[in-house]
């Protein structure tokens, strides 16, 4: 049976941790907190939160090792290992893309990744 996008998002949300916008801003007080905006570049350019890095959902898995806080940019595996236990928050427009992306990063082995519930619309 085929699944709708809404079903995929609901399934992802059952496996991940979501946080409120207030919890995100509290977490951002820690300079080691990573905020990744998974919206498309034109959405990011229109409005973005300070310190957010734009890795659209379609390329997140291939680019996360390039995050500025990764200390091993030349070695993908070492960069991923460096980032895997860092607090990572994902945000999008409404919370759907960030939920799916959070689920994917958890499957990659990231341990402290969370999705911002409701995204920018919250």
Regions inferred by a protein language model and the residue ranges of each:
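Catalytic cysteine-centered active loop of the rhodanese-like fold, especially the PTP/DSP P-loop
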Residues: 70-122
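Short amphipathic alpha-helical segments
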Residues: 46-49, 66, 102-104
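Conserved beta-strand positions in the Rossmann-like core of class I SAM-dependent methyltransferases
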Residues: 34, 53, 114
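Thiol-based oxidoreductase modules, predominantly thioredoxin-like and allied folds used
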Residues: 53-60
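Nucleotide phosphate-binding site architecture
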Residues: 45, 61, 121
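Short, charged, surface-exposed secondary-structure boundary motifs
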Residues: 62-68
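Flexible, polar/low-complexity N-terminal or interdomain linker segments that lie immediately upstream
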Residues: 1-50
């Amino acid at each position: 049976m085929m699944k709708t996008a809404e079903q995929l998002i609901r399934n992802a949300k059952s496996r991940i941790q979501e946080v409120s916008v207030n919890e995100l801003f509290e977490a951002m007080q820690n300079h080691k907190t990573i905020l990744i905006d998974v919206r498309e570049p034109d959405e990011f350019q229109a409005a973005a939160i300070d310190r957010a890095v734009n890795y659209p959902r379609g390329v997140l898995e291939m680019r996360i090792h390039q995050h500025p806080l990764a200390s091993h940019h030349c070695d993908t595996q070492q960069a991923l290992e460096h980032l895997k236990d860092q607090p990572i928050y994902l945000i999008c427009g409404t919370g759907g893309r960030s939920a799916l992306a959070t689920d994917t990063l958890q499957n990659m082995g990231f341990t402290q990744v969370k999705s911002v519930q409701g995204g920018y619309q919250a």
